[in-house]
Amino acid sequence: MAAVLAIAISLVGLGAAGWWWLQSQSPLKLQHQSLTTPATTRFLPADANLTLVLEADPGRLPDYGRAVAPMRQRRQAAEQLEHLRDALFAAAGLDYATELADWLGDESALALSSGDTPGWVLALSSRDDDGGRQFLQRFWQSRSLAGGDLDITRYRGLGVISSRGQQSQGRPSTTSPQAEHPPLASALINDQLVLLASSRGQLEDALDASQEEARNLAGDPLLEQWLGSNRQGIALLRGDRQGIEQLLGLPASWSADQPIEQFVGSLQLDGAGVRLAAQLQNSSGESIAPLSRRDQQLLGNLNQPVQLLSLSRPNGPLATLFNLTAASDDILLPALLEGEQPLLEAQLQDSKAWLIGSSDSAPPAANLNEALAKQGFDANNLDGLQVWSHLTGQSDRQGQLQATVAGATGVAQSNRWWSNSLDGLRAQLQGHGSGGVPSELLERLNAPSGAIALLGADGRSTAELLKPWPLWRGLQLLAGQRLGPSLQGAALALSQDQSSAELDALLTFR
C-alpha cells in the first residue's frame, strides 16, 4: 500500500512539474509579464527623442500569434508576425533569421534622435556569452567583404568598430539605416550586450551617457516612477515633444495652450490585440473635471449599433480626435458641439447619420432655435419629437410638399438625444439594443473612473483614424499588406491632473 501511495505521489508531482514547465514555456505568459528596469537603459541616452525597449525574445512573437489566433488562422497569424518582425530588423540593416535568431536575448532597445544630428542607437542583449561576439565578427566580416572600410579603435576601454559607409552607383553616404551600406559603429559590453549605432559619434555619445546616471535612461525619474507602479507588458516607450511630432508624426499638444513635453508608457499584449498605457507630461494648466457617473451611463443607454462613439467635452483636450466631423451642409452638429457639457457622439453603423446624447434633459436653448431659424429651419413637434425642417417647394409622388430636415431631438430615460436622422433618433428612443463593437471594446478597456474622455471604434472606423498616421502607413509597408481589414476595433480613455495626463488605449485584431 505504501508503495502504491508513493507511486501516486510521484506521478502527481511529475504531473504538477510538467504542468508548471508547460505554463512557464507558454507564449501566453507574455500577456501578464511584469516590466523591470532594462539593463539596456544604461546605454540609451536620456536626450534621445524617442526610445523603445522590447522586453521579450522576438522569436516568441510568432508563437504568441499562433496561440491567440482562431484555429484556421493560426499559421497565417504566425507568418504575419514573423514577417513583420523580420522587416523591422531589416529596416536597421539586420537579417533576423541569419544574424540574430540564434543568440538574441530578451532585451532589444532602439533610441532615435531627430533634429540637426539625426541618428539611432540599437542595444541588443545576448542569451549567452559568445552570441554577441560571434555576431559582430560575422557582421563586420560580411560588410568588409562587401567593400566597406573598417576602423578599429578603443573608446572608454572598449573595442569600437566603425565604417564610413558605402553607397552603390555613387550615391552620397547617409545615416539612414535603410542605405545599402550605411555608416555604422559597434561595441560589445561584457559579452552580454551589443551596441550598434548609425555613426561612431552616436555610439560614443551612448558610451559617454552610460557613465553619468543623469544622461542615460537608467537614471530617468519619469521611467523609474512608471516602473515603480508594477506595470505589465512587453515593451517600454519613452520620448519627448520632438519625438512625438517628428518621429511618431502625432500632434504634441494636449490643448491649445498645453503642449506635451514628455511621455512614458508601456505596451501589453491582450489576446489578439495590444494595450498602450502612457503618462503624458504637459505644462501646468486648468484640469478638466472627470466625466460623472451619470455622463458615463449614457454609454449603457445606447440602444443601437454604432461604428464610432465618444464621450467627452466638445472643447476638451484632443478635441479633433473625439469630436465628429460635420458635413458641409450640416448646421445642427456644429451648433451642438459649441457647448461645454459632456456629450456622447456616435456615428450610426453603415450610415452617414450621427447621434448625440446628453445627460441634461433640458429642452433646446432659445439661441439654438434662433440660429437654425436664420438658416431657414423652423422647430415643429412631430410625434413627440422636436424637428427642425424647412419646405423645399417640391412635391413627392403623392403630391405632398417635401421637407429638408436639419435634425431632431427627444428625451428617453432622463437623457436628451439628437440626430440628423429621424429614423436613427426613433431607434434610439424606442430601442433596446447596444452600441456594438465600440461599446464592447470600451467595456473591455475598463477605463479609470476619473476619465475625462472616452472613444470607441469598430474596425472600419479605426482604419480611418489610423490612415493619416505615417507610422501606421510604415507598418503596413513593412508588413507587405494592408492591415486595415484585420482590425476589429479600438478603444481609448484619457484622464488628467494639473501637470500630467494618463492615456489608456486598446487596439484589437480579428
Identify the residue ranges that each predicted region occupies.
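Leucine-rich, highly hydrophobic segment in Treponema pallidum outer-membrane-associated proteins
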Residues: 2-21, 31-40, 171-172, 189-190, ...
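Structural boundary/hinge residues at secondary-structure and domain interfaces
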Residues: 3-6, 12-157, 239, 245-256, ...
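Short, isolated positions within intrinsically disordered regulatory regions of eukaryotic proteins
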Residues: 23-25, 107, 124, 144, ...
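Single conserved position on a long alpha-helix in the C-terminal lobe of the eukaryotic protein kinase
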Residues: 52, 96-223, 339-444
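Glycine-rich loops and low-complexity Gly/Arg-rich segments
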Residues: 75-80, 146-150, 219-222, 260-263, ...
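Alpha-helix boundary/N-cap detector
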Residues: 76-79, 363, 460
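A eukaryote-biased signal for long
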Residues: 314, 326-327, 334-370, 489-509
